[in-house]
C-alpha cells in the first residue's frame, strides 16, 4: 500500500537523516559557490589581460572544466592526488576543491564575457572625462558588469547545487546517499519505498532550485 511505503520515510529518524543530508548538500554548495565567486572574479580579470602566459593558462583551465566530467575530476582529486601525495583528504574537502575549480572557471568566463560585452565607446567616454583606468573600471565598467553577471551567476549556482549528488560516489553522505541507505534498509518491508523517497528528494531539490531560477529569470529580464 502507498501509505505503508511512504511511512518508511517517517520511521525512526529517517526524515531527520534526510534533512541532514540536504544540509550537507547545501553546505557543500554554499562553500563552493562562495569560493567560486571570489576566484572567478579574479580569473575573469586575468582573462582580460594581454599577457599571453596568463591567457594560455586561463584558457587551459576553462577547457579542462569543459572537457573533463566533474565525476572524473572528483575521482582524480580524491583517489588520485590524495593518495599520490599521501594527503589525508575527506570526501567533503575533495568535493569543495573540485566544485570550486569548476565553478571558478565558469565564473571567470562569465566575468570575461560581461566585460567584453560593454562597448568600447564607454571606455573612451570615461577617458575623455578624465577618469583613470581604475576609476573607469570602478564607476563605469564594474556596475554594468555586475548587472549582466548576476543572473548568469545565479544560474551557475543552481547547476552546482544539482551536481552535488556526484559526491556520494566518493563517500560523502549527502541527501541522495541518505535516501539510498533508507531504501536499502526497507528493501524487504517496503520494496516500493524508493518511488516515494526519491520523490521527496525530487521535491527538496525543486524547492531549493526553483525560487533561485525564478530570481535569475526576473533579474535577466530586468537588467539584460
Each language-model region and where it sits:
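Transmembrane alpha-helices and adjacent helix-loop boundaries
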Residues: 1-224
Amino acid at each position: 500500500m502507498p501509505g505503508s511505503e511512504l511511512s518508511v520515510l517517517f520511521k525512526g529518524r529517517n526524515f531527520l537523516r534526510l534533512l541532514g543530508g540536504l544540509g550537507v548538500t547545501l553546505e557543500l554548495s554554499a562553500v563552493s559557490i562562495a569560493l567560486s565567486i571570489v576566484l572567478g572574479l579574479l580569473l575573469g580579470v586575468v582573462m582580460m589581460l594581454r599577457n599571453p602566459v596568463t591567457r594560455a593558462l586561463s584558457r587551459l583551465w576553462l577547457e579542462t572544466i569543459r572537457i573533463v566530467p566533474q565525476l572524473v575530476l572528483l575521482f582524480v582529486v580524491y583517489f588520485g592526488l590524495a593518495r599520490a601525495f599521501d594527503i589525508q583528504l575527506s570526501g567533503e574537502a575533495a568535493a569543495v576543491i573540485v566544485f570550486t575549480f569548476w565553478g571558478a572557471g565558469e565564473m571567470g568566463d562569465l566575468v570575461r564575457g560581461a566585460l567584453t560585452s560593454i562597448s568600447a565607446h564607454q571606455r573612451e567616454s570615461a577617458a575623455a572625462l578624465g577618469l583613470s583606468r581604475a576609476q573607469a573600471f570602478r564607476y563605469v565598467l564594474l556596475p554594468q558588469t555586475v548587472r549582466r553577471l548576476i543572473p548568469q551567476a545565479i544560474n551557475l549556482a543552481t547547476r552546482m547545487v544539482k551536481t552535488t549528488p556526484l559526491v556520494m560516489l566518493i563517500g560523502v553522505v549527502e541527501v541522495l546517499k541518505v535516501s539510498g541507505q533508507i531504501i536499502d534498509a526497507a528493501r524487504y518491508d517496503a520494496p516500493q519505498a524508493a518511488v516515494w523517497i526519491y520523490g521527496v528528494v525530487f521535491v527538496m531539490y525543486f524547492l531549493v532550485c526553483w525560487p533561485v531560477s525564478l530570481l535569475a529569470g526576473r533579474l535577466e529580464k530586468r537588467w539584460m
